[in-house]
C-alpha cells in the first residue's frame, strides 16, 4: 500500500455521489482507531493533520505510521495537510512524500489568496500532489486559529468560479454556514448558495466544520456536490470523554493499554457514524484502481 493523492478518492466520490470522510489525526491511537473502522466498513479515507499535529509528532513519524497502517490494514489512504498557510512548509512535506495539501489563504483578500494558492498548485502538481483551497471564511477555532463571527463570511458563487479558473486548484472548501468546533445553536446552512456554487464550479467541493452538524444537513450538502467532509472536534470530544469516565471509574488505573483503547472505541463510534452519513461504506477500491 502507499500514500495516495486525494484527487483519486474525490474523483470517484464525485462520479458516484458520495463523500470521502476526512478525519483529523493526532497520534498512533487515533490513526489506528479510524483505520479499524474503515477496514470494517470498506470505506476510503483521508487522514488530515494540521500544522499543530505535525509539531506534536514529526512529519517523518506520521508518514511512517500512515504507511505502515496502510499496509497492515490493506487500505490505500491519503495523508492530507489540513489548514496549512506556508508554501515553504507545504513544499517540505510534499517533498517528504505527502500527496494532498490544503493551502489556507482565506484570511487574505481575493487576489492575494489567488496568488498564494496558484504558487502552491504550480509546485504540488509537478509532484502529483492535489491541492485544496478555501474561499470564504469559517468561524470558530481550528488548531491555533480563531475566527470570530464578525470576520467569517460566506463563499460568493461567482468569485468561486473565478477563483478555480485562476488557480487550477483541485478541490474547494466552501463557507456556507458551518463553523469549526461545536455549535451553541443549530447551524444555518445556506443550501441555495451551495447549489449555486455547484452550478459554476465543477471540481469537488469540501465541507469544513462538519462536527455537530445534523446528519440530514450533511447528507443534503453531499447531494448538492460536497465530496469531502471534514470531522475533527467530535472525534476529540468522544475520545477525551471516554478516557475521563474511565479514570473516574478506575481512579487507581495507570495502564495506557486500557484507557487508550477505551478512548479509541469511543472515537470509532463517531467514525462509524460519519462514514454512514457520507455513504462511503463499501466504496473502497483496490489500490491499483486509484
From Swiss-Prot:
Co-factor(s): Zn(2+)
Active site feature: 82 (proton donor)
GO (cellular component) term, any one: cytosol
UniProt binding sites for dihydroxyacetone phosphate: 181, 209-211, 230-233
E.C. number(s) listed in UniProt: 4.1.2.40
GO biological process terms held by the UniProt record: carbohydrate metabolic process; D-tagatose 6-phosphate catabolic process
Subunit structure: Homotetramer. Forms a complex with KbaZ.
Role description: Catalytic subunit of the tagatose-1,6-bisphosphate aldolase KbaYZ, which catalyzes the reversible aldol condensation of dihydroxyacetone phosphate (DHAP or glycerone-phosphate) with glyceraldehyde 3-phosphate (G3P) to produce tagatose 1,6-bisphosphate (TBP). Requires KbaZ subunit for full activity and stability.
Protein known as: D-tagatose-1,6-bisphosphate aldolase subunit KbaY
The species this protein was found in: Salmonella arizonae (strain ATCC BAA-731 / CDC346-86 / RSK2980)
Amino acid at each position: 500500500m502507499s500514500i495516495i493523492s486525494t484527487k483519486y478518492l474525490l474523483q470517484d466520490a464525485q462520479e458516484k455521489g458520495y463523500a470521502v470522510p476526512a478525519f483529523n489525526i493526532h497520534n498512533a491511537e487515533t490513526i489506528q482507531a479510524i483505520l479499524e473502522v474503515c477496514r470494517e466498513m470498506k470505506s476510503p479515507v483521508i487522514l488530515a493533520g494540521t500544522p499543530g499535529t505535525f509539531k506534536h509528532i514529526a512529519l517523518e513519524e506520521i508518514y511512517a505510521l500512515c504507511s505502515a497502517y496502510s499496509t497492515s490494514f490493506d487500505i490505500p489512504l491519503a495523508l492530507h495537510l489540513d489548514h496549512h498557510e506556508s508554501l515553504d512548509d507545504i513544499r517540505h512535506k510534499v517533498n517528504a512524500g505527502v500527496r494532498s495539501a490544503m493551502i489556507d489563504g482565506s484570511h487574505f483578500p481575493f487576489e492575494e489568496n489567488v496568488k498564494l494558492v496558484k504558487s502552491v498548485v504550480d509546485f504540488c502538481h509537478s509532484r502529483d500532489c492535489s491541492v485544496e483551497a478555501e474561499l470564504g471564511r469559517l468561524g470558530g477555532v481550528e488548531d491555533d486559529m480563531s475566527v470570530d463571527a464578525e470576520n467569517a463570511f460566506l463563499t460568493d458563487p461567482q468569485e468561486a468560479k473565478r477563483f478555480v479558473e485562476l488557480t487550477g486548484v483541485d478541490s474547494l472548501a466552501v463557507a456556507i454556514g458551518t463553523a469549526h468546533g461545536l455549535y451553541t445553536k443549530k447551524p444555518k446552512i445556506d443550501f441555495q448558495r451551495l447549489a449555486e456554487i455547484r452550478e459554476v464550479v465543477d471540481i469537488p467541493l469540501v465541507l469544513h466544520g462538519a462536527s455537530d452538524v445534523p446528519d440530514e444537513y450533511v447528507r443534503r450538502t453531499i447531494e448538492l456536490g460536497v465530496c469531502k467532509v471534514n470531522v475533527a472536534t467530535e472525534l476529540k470530544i468522544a475520545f477525551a470523554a471516554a478516557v475521563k469516565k474511565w479514570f473516574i471509574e478506575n481512579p487507581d488505573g495507570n495502564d495506557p493499554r486500557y484507557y487508550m483503547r477505551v478512548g479509541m472505541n469511543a472515537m470509532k463510534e463517531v467514525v462509524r457514524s460519519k462514514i454512514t452519513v457520507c455513504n462511503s461504506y463499501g466504496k473502497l477500491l483496490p489500490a491499483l484502481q486509484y
